[in-house]
UniProtKB/Swiss-Prot annotation:
The gene is glmM. This is Phosphoglucosamine mutase. It holds the Pfam family PGM_PMM_II. PROSITE patterns: PGM_PMM. It comes from the Bacteria. One of its GO terms (biological process) is peptidoglycan biosynthetic process. Catalyzes the conversion of glucosamine-6-phosphate to glucosamine-1-phosphate. The active site is at S102 (phosphoserine intermediate). Mg(2+) binds at S102, D247, D249, D251. It comes from Kineococcus radiotolerans (strain ATCC BAA-149 / DSM 14245 / SRS30216).
Length: 454
């Protein structure tokens, strides 16, 4: 039986892959697993969502499931995923549940669970929750022991206000320190809409906002971090210093410089890593990144005397490594950046704020700051219709990968990775020249199709 939880919670087509019944059942299961025996008579949980339409009935189902299991619920409405994580941490709640499919199209939705302290659940705990869900049962109190539910517009506004105040408190130069910078921010018609433009403005920046009018149907629709065209055009049209683009739940951020060049998570991490180093805040001179980060980032960090630790794909694996090592920064090429001093998970609004802070404190352009990373051409081929479970064990395929690595030498890299959320194998190749990377990737993709055919 396929595992429900992927690399970032449960995700799929709302009302088909993720139904109200499933959301309710997972909520009951989470309550049975995450509430400590003998703890609070009424454990507490926070529930939030992004603005997509299906989030309304799915969050209602989660709230119902939790309350029926004896959990008091604070429904904080539409806020970014990192806002929920922060509020779970600072409020002392037992856990939190977020309804979002991040950058996915509007018809999809997802459910992710945050433990006490605002951290994502480890794989083994997700497995226990999934087992409890499949077995059914769980806590079913009666009378005064059932959970109570609180929510509404005032609760949502208070959650947003608290999150904005927290973000401003992290600003190295304090409120107003971004004065003189003009930023275009694309909120993807998502959860960032009510907070990202506001926090940037309160930090002193001149803000031009696009795609910040969510109606439940337009989230990620031709906008946001997966569609950089609109924010690029707006930066050039307005003569802005920088553009920021969030995804639907604002746990990631990509950028565009004043000349319209895209800035990915690797480049953002490099800028923020060196900022921490220059302030004496980069623990062990170490950056944590995933195996998908461009080799150019590793080479740049080597030149700067920074050690790079690699993890699997997913910001929770980055966070696990950060916590284990006590390090200061980590993230993904996709724009998830984790700053443990200020957040318990990837936070796109925080990332954008600190990127502008670095520009303000140095007086340098984003193009100049990101020049530290010389990205190698990277080619990614998704091979569908294969048995991804054999990708790490087929001898002929592994031999082909080894041959490719020898061919590329120190100026290239090969990564073969089964997708954690889709039935496919990703072949990623980096080389000094695009044609070389494409040729190697195509050859390996052919071997994958041949050797892993169903």
């Amino acid at each position: 039986m396929a595992r429900l939880f992927g690399t970032d919670g449960v995700r799929g087509l709302a009302n088909v892959d993720l139904t109200a019944d499933m959301a309710l059942g997972l909520a009951v299961a989470a309550a049975s697993v995450l509430v400590e025996p003998g703890g609070n008579a009424h454990p507490r949980a926070l529930v939030a969502r992004d603005p997509r339409a299906s989030g309304e009935f799915l969050s209602a189902a989660v709230v119902a499931g939790l309350a029926s299991a004896g959990v008091d619920v604070l429904d904080i409405g539409v806020v970014p995923t990192p806002a929920l994580a922060h509020l779970v941490d600072t409020s002392g709640a037992d856990f939190g549940v977020m309804l979002s499919a991040s950058h996915n199209p509007m018809p999809d939705n997802g459910l992710k669970i945050f433990a006490r302290g605002g951290t994502k659940l480890p794989d083994d705990v997700e497995d226990v929750v999934e087992r409890a869900y499949r077995e059914g049962g769980g806590r079913r109190p009666t009378g005064a022991a059932v959970g109570r539910v609180h929510g509404g517009p005032d609760v949502e506004q208070d959650a947003q206000d608290t999150y904005v105040a927290h973000l401003l408190s992290t600003l190295p130069g304090g409120p107003g320190s971004l004065k003189g910078l003009h930023v275009v921010v694309d909120c993807a018609n998502g959860a960032a809409s009510a907070v990202s433009p506001r926090v940037l403005a309160e930090a002193g920046a001149r803000v031009t906002t696009i795609f910040a009018a969510p109606d439940g149907l337009n989230i990620n629709d031709g906008c946001g971090s997966t569609h950089l065209g609109p924010v690029t055009a707006a930066v050039l049209a307005h003569g802005a210093d920088i553009g920021l683009a969030h995804d639907g739940d604002a746990d990631r951020c990509l950028a565009v410089d004043a000349r319209g060049n895209a800035v990915d998570g690797d480049q953002i991490m490099a800028v923020l890593t060196l900022a921490l180093r220059d302030r004496g805040q980069l623990t062990d001179d170490t950056l944590v990144a995933t195996v998908m980060s461009n080799l150019g980032l590793r080479l740049a960090m080597q030149r700067e005397g920074v050690t790079m630790v690699e993890t699997g794909v997913g910001d929770r694996y980055v966070l696990e490594a950060l916590n284990a090592g006590g390090w200061s920064i980590g993230g993904e090429q996709s724009g998830h950046v984790v700053l443990p001093a200020h957040a318990t998970t990837g936070d796109g609004v925080l990332t954008g704020l600190h990127l502008l802070a670095r520009m303000a404190e140095t007086g340098r352009s984003l193009e100049d700051l990101t020049g530290v990373v010389q990205r190698l051409p990277q080619v990614l081929v998704n091979v569908r219709g294969v048995d991804k479970s054999r990708a790490g064990s087929d001898a002929e395929l592994l031999g082909a990968v080894a041959d490719a690595e020898r061919e590329l030498g120190e100026t290239g890299r090969v990564l073969l990775r089964p997708s954690g959320t889709e039935p496919l194998v990703r072949v990623m190749v980096e080389a000094a020249h695009t044609d070389h990377a494409q040729g190697v990737a195509d050859r390996l993709a052919d071997v994958v199709r041949k050797r892993l055919a169903l």
